[in-house]
Amino acid sequence: MSEGESQTVLSSGSDPKVESSSSAPGLTSVSPPVTSTTSAASPEEEEESEDESEILEESPCGRWQKRREEVNQRNVPGIDSAYLAMDTEEGVEVVWNEVQFSERKNYKLQEEKVRAVFDNLIQLEHLNIVKFHKYWADIKENKARVIFITEYMSSGSLKQFLKKTKKNHKTMNEKAWKRWCTQILSALSYLHSCDPPIIHGNLTCDTIFIQHNGLIKIGSVAPDTINNHVKTCREEQKNLHFFAPEYGEVTNVTTAVDIYSFGMCALEMAVLEIQGNGESSYVPQEAISSAIQLLEDPLQREFIQKCLQSEPARRPTARELLFHPALFEVPSLKLLAAHCIVGHQHMIPENALEEITKNMDTSAVLAEIPAGPGREPVQTLYSQSPALELDKFLEDVRNGIYPLTAFGLPRPQQPQQEEVTSPVVPPSVKTPTPEPAEVETRKVVLMQCNIESVEEGVKHHLTLLLKLEDKLNRHLSCDLMPNENIPELAAELVQLGFISEADQSRLTSLLEETLNKFNFARSSTLNSAAVTVSS
């Protein structure tokens, strides 16, 4: 079975060119994108650019290509080096992270733990968390390394945005603050709902990224499992005031440490900057207390103080904070409808909104709140919700800017039941297991199948075009024997990672239907048949 893929739809906008940022363990940190200029590049600059794009090595599957250009990870614990890389399947840039183990035997002692932890992290799927794509081990004679691929964030950190806002003598918008807090808490609630809970452990304004459209993403998690057994040593942490008081005092921290860090982020977002002690980056408790007193909204002040309780057990959970009066709002009918549309977008034609609104009377009443005691009726006209604004709102909901937090939040799949934050494991002498094939989870929204005769009565040629829910086209072809077992063929496509298991029965039905039509057409002196099935 051969395959070719193409990205048919580009993203609606590119991320802004912002300064570089530091990064948390395991997250894709940001290297400063080069600002374009009108002057022609010198031969030296062109040569340097070519050197940076040179491919140094590939992943075992051939999908990920490591470039020479390094990504600035600053002092990220556990990450020895990070490079820009290319995802050849989807045509996007990613980050190639490397963790060097000082000796091969050190990796052997940790192998089972490392695999269990990374298998968990790959399952994480949340719009407000930097995506963790893939990992594998590279074991040589006397050394070993673990390589993992993460999403590349071309936008800047929240810290940079806050600095720029303060530099321009602006204040923080309350609505923006609520929107950012909601997105961060939605991601933390997702991590903490795992069984066992996943603790981020390094949440600061430097490890939170903001895109041009207001989308917030927190850095993906780098497990402590790798931090104490790697070549690099943990250096003195900056931003110490973001770390809960119990850090270093107890062996096993809880999700409450993330709540403390979030509270400090929420405070910094509200006041733009917490003043440190002179040239030192150290922020004393007095400066934190002074910053809290600057908050005018008593609800906002109470919200942050709850997060910064010195006793971990007294801090609320991420889920509880989403319902705090400082943040919670009853979701509007517009937001509920938008989430319903986004959740069923594979069933709705792409131009449905345009078709519905093009012949609509804009002066007609869309919705009405009837009059009540001492209250005039309120009408909403179609003209108050232009199609372009609705399109943008749907795109924002689709991207995760307005998570629906009043209901049950999505929970991650957990294939392993291993604690992801504890580095303590018993030695293992098991041999490495072969790397499993990558499982396809994306839904196929359109299937097209064609069968043509190659050698009469001997073999046919099958062509499949699959359109996935993220607009990716997958083109597959193979020779088909007259006595081919169709269910086995569909099962093989699942096993090879071309389609998800959920689409196996649909594809089996499509193939059988097409083959029956082909045989009927062949008996009618025709030599090909085609059928299209759309979900």
UniProtKB/Swiss-Prot annotation:
Write out the coiled-coil annotation as residue ranges. Answer: none
Where in or outside the cell it occurs: the entry states: Cytoplasm, Cell cortex; Endomembrane system; Cell projection, Lamellipodium
Give the N-acetylserine positions (modified residues).
S2
User: Per the record's keyword annotation, is tRNA-binding included, yes or no?
Assistant: no
Q: What is its main location?
A: cytoplasm
- From what superkingdom does this record's organism come? Eukaryota
SUPFAM superfamilies linked to this entry:
Protein kinase-like (PK-like)
**Location of Phosphothreonine modifications:** T431, T433
Which residue stretches belong to region Disordered? Answer: 1-70, 409-437
> Which intervals carry biased composition (Polar residues)?
1-26
Q: Which residues carry this modification: Phosphoserine?
A: S2
Tell me the Gene Ontology biological-process terms attached to this UniProt entry.
endoplasmic reticulum to Golgi vesicle-mediated transport
Q: Which family does it belong to?
A: Belongs to the protein kinase superfamily. Ser/Thr protein kinase family.
In the record's own words, the domains note is: The protein kinase domain is predicted to be catalytically inactive.
- Name listed for the protein in its UniProt record: Nuclear receptor-binding protein
